Structure formats: C-alpha cells, structure tokens
C-alpha cells in the first residue's frame, strides 16, 4: 500500500497486468492490487498529461432529442459528468411570425398565434385580441370576457398537465404522464364543444369571441372539475412522498430571486424563486379583478419548487373557473360595431349588407388608429406580450411578440453549470419551454 505522501498514477499496476498467457490466479491477484490502490482514501490519484480523463469534452444535446422538449440544441462542455459551460441554441423552429404579421390583417393573423405556444393556444388568441382592442379602444361584452377567462384557465391547466407529466417521465416514471394526458383529452373535448376545434382553435375575435358558451358545455366543465380536483391531491400524495422523485428535483437548477429578475424570468419559474408577481393580480385584465384567487410562491428557486408551483396553480385555476361559471353574466359575446368587428357567419348567407360588410373587413381589415401599444397576459409559461405599432392601416406596421419561453431559456446556462449532466434533462423539463413560442 502506498503511503500518504506517495502518488499513484493510473498506469501504476496497469503496466504490470499479466499477459493473456498467465494463469487465472495471477490475473486475479493483479486485479485485486489495482482495486486496493483505488480504495485507498489516503492516496492521491494523478493522471498522465495525454489521459483523456484530464480533458474536457464538448457534447451536443439535441436538437432531435426527446428530453429537450422540442427542437432545442444545448452545447455542453463537460468535465467528466459535471457541466462546466452550456450554450443553448435556438431557432430550429423559426417561422418568421413577426414578419408574417406585417402582411396579415389582425383577423388573419389570429390562427398564427395558435402555433406559438401550441400547448395553450387560447392564451395566445386572447393576448393578441386584448392588445388590438386596447389600441382600437374596442369594448368587449362582459359575457365574452368571462368566457375568455374560463377558456384561458382551462388552457393553463392543460399546459401544466403536460409539463408535470413530462417532468415526471424525465425522472423515469411513466404512469403520471399517462394520467395527465387522460385529463388533457377531457379538456380537449371541452374545447371541441366550446370552439369547434380541439387544438388550434382560433376562437377569439377582435371585440369578442366566435361562439357562445352553451349550457351543455358549461355542465361538461362543471362535471370535469368535480372529478379533477381529487386527482390533483392524489398526484401530489404520490409524488411528494416519492424519495426518488424528490431527490432528482430538490436542490437541482437553483436560481435566486435577484438572478431571476435580472434574467427576465416570468410566470411559475419566477414565482418559484420568491418573486410575488402575477399579471392577473398586479395588472388585471379580463375578469380576474372580480375573482378571488391566491398567487402561490416558493423561495427555494429549484426544480422541485417549479414543479410545486404548477401543481398549486392548477388548484387555483379550478377555483377561478368555478367562480367565473357562477358569475357568468348574460348578454352578447361580441361587439356589434360594424367598423371594427366582423358580422356573424350565419347572417352572411341571408343578408346582402352582412355579405358586403364581411367582404370589406376581409379585404381591408380593421382600420386601426395610429399609435403603438403593448399588452401582456399571464400565460401558462409566463408573460406573453404583444407590441403593436400602427400607421392607421388594416395591417400592423410592426408586431413584436414577447414570448416567455424565449426569456426563460436564457436562464438555462446558469441553472445547469456546475451540475451533473443527468440533471440537465430535469432542469429543462422544470423550465417547461415550448420551442414554437421561443423561436416564433
């Protein structure tokens, strides 16, 4: 056995390995000697200069990798299994959304917003409509405002279900992923009944919504909420007591309150670091000012806190939907100003005036006033904002999208550097990015 002051090289003992012709007993003794050297805690291991273990390695993770949650490429510099440096590379799903908006009327651009955060398309529709309505000073009927609120919270639950299910699957468990997808399918059935489409819905309209909330749809939502609430508690009992799940997330990907603000995090990722900020409460829009709900926050700023945030937000979304259904007012669901909104589709087939009105709106679009506006909402991923610059035409001169996933991914290098390569997958899942929204 080597003394404390003596050094052992990796090649020490290896260079005296027996030749293949040696007996098995001699070969066994040589192996035991090497094992004894490696188990000596007082010995100091040194490596030769050309040893590959002394060199850092660059690893490409993605863009075609199931753990990156989309076409995200992360270039990792590794020292063994520890991440020394990380560079996220975006743009693989870039479709020039902002440039396309400059050649589309505000109504024509609505379906494009569905393809931003395609996990919660209703939130994207709502954000664009609110920005346009704010610039054009269009009043939206109160019933339409409440229906938008209900649909946005359903979209939030749907998005968080996917996020939690995928995160748990990243840790090696598949069951929760299947359970969350079962509930998402039920939400899609609700959207199908409400909007006529399950996924890319384009239900919002400037000045209101495309169709009213039927009694049948409202009853379906109530029945689903009743059976969904206990399931959240079941999942929390299962995951919050699972030692493997907790150890994979707790203390992994920690970011402080100050760093989260400096980088520009928003949504659950920001509140998980202790920042008590939610646009629904701090800058109320839709019907949130009339509803009672809590804004959960955590101080740890790690992956486990981000998971907890989304679990608690689903519970609050259930409360919001229940209140909105109870308070749902009667009345119209769309502004009837002929210069700012489209006519109803069923009127076009029977009225020449409505047909001409629809043709003019399709050809010229809404004649917006000159000016600029920025409006943001609390989307499931964070602050989703639309900046519109108008020259008084039917199309925007400039439309800028503030996507939360793009801003949240800026924190990725800080979160993964110094951690293990196995934790990179967990950290990306806890951030919950959507690349369609990040790349635009």
From Swiss-Prot:
GO cellular component terms, alphabetically, are: plasma membrane
- Its primary localisation, in coarse terms, equals membrane
Specify the superkingdom: Bacteria
Q: Fetch the InterPro entries from UniProt.
A: NADH_Q_OxRdtase_suD, NADH_UbQ_OxRdtase_49kDa_CS, NDH1_su_D/H, NiFe-Hase_large
Q: Where are the transmembrane segments?
A: none
Q: Which PROSITE patterns match?
A: COMPLEX1_49K (PS00535)
- Enzyme class at the top of the EC tree: translocase
Molecular function terms from GO: NAD binding; NADH:ubiquinone reductase (non-electrogenic) activity; quinone binding
- Catalyses which reaction(s): a quinone + NADH + 5 H(+)(in) = a quinol + NAD(+) + 4 H(+)(out)
EC number, as in UniProt: 7.1.1.-
Is the keyword Cell inner membrane in the record?
yes
Q: Which UniProt keywords apply?
A: Cell inner membrane, Cell membrane, Membrane, NAD, Quinone, Translocase, Transport
What is the similarity comment for this entry?
Belongs to the complex I 49 kDa subunit family.
Give the multimer and partner information: NDH-1 is composed of 14 different subunits. Subunits NuoB, C, D, E, F, and G constitute the peripheral sector of the complex.
What this chain does, per the entry, is described as: NDH-1 shuttles electrons from NADH, via FMN and iron-sulfur (Fe-S) centers, to quinones in the respiratory chain. The immediate electron acceptor for the enzyme in this species is believed to be a menaquinone. Couples the redox reaction to proton translocation (for every two electrons transferred, four hydrogen ions are translocated across the cytoplasmic membrane), and thus conserves the redox energy in a proton gradient.
Q: Report the protein name in the record.
A: NADH-quinone oxidoreductase subunit D 1
Whichever gene encodes this chain, its name is nuoD1
């Amino acid at each position: 056995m080597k003394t404390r002051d003596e050094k052992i090289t990796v090649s020490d003992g290896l260079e005296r390995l027996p030749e293949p012709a040696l007996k098995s007993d001699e070969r066994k003794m040589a192996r035991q000697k090497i094992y004894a050297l490696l188990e000596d805690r007082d010995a100091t291991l040194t490596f030769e200069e050309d040893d590959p273990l002394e060199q850092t390695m660059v690893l490409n993770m993605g863009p075609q990798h199931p753990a990156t949650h989309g076409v995200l490429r992360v270039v990792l510099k590794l020292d063994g299994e520890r991440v020394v440096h990380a560079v996220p590379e975006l743009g693989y799903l870039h479709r020039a959304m902002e440039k396309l908006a400059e050649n589309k009327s505000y109504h024509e651009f609505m379906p494009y917003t569905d393809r931003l955060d395609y996990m919660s398309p209703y939130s994207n529709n709502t954000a664009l409509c609110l920005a346009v309505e704010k610039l054009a000073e269009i009043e939206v009927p109160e019933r339409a405002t409440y229906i938008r609120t209900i649909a946005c919270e359903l979209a939030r639950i749907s998005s968080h279900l996917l996020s939690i299910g995928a995160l748990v699957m990243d840790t090696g468990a598949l069951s929760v992923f299947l359970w969350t997808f079962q509930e998402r399918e039920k939400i899609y059935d609700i959207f199908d009944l409400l909007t006529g489409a399950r996924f890319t819905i384009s239900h919002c309209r400037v000045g209101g919504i495309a169709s009213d909330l039927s009694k049948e749809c409202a009853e379906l939502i109530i029945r689903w909420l009743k059976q969904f609430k206990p399931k959240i508690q079941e999942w929390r009992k299962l995951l919050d007591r699972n030692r493997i799940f907790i150890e994979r997330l707790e203390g992994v990907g920690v970011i402080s309150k100050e760093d989260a603000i400096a980088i520009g995090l928003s949504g659950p990722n920001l509140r998980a670091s202790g920042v008590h900020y939610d646009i629904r409460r701090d800058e109320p829009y839709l019907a949130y000012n009339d509803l009672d709900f809590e804004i959960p926050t955590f101080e740890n700023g790690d992956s486990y806190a981000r998971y907890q945030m989304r679990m608690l937000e689903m519970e609050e979304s259930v409360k919001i939907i229940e209140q909105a259904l109870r308070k749902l007012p009667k009345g119209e669901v769309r502004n009837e100003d002929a210069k700012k909104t489209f006519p109803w589709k069923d009127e076009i087939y029977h009225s020449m005036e409505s047909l001409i009105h629809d043709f003019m709106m399709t050809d010229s679009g809404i004649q917006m006033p000159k000016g600029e506006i920025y409006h943001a909402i609390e989307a499931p991923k964070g602050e989703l904002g639309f900046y519109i610059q108008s020259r008084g035409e039917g199309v925007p001169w400039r439309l800028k999208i503030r996507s939360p996933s793009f801003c949240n991914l800026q924190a990725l290098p800080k979160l993964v550097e110094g951690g293990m390569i196995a934790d990179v997958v967990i950290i990306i899942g806890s951030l919950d990015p959507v690349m369609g929204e990040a790349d635009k």
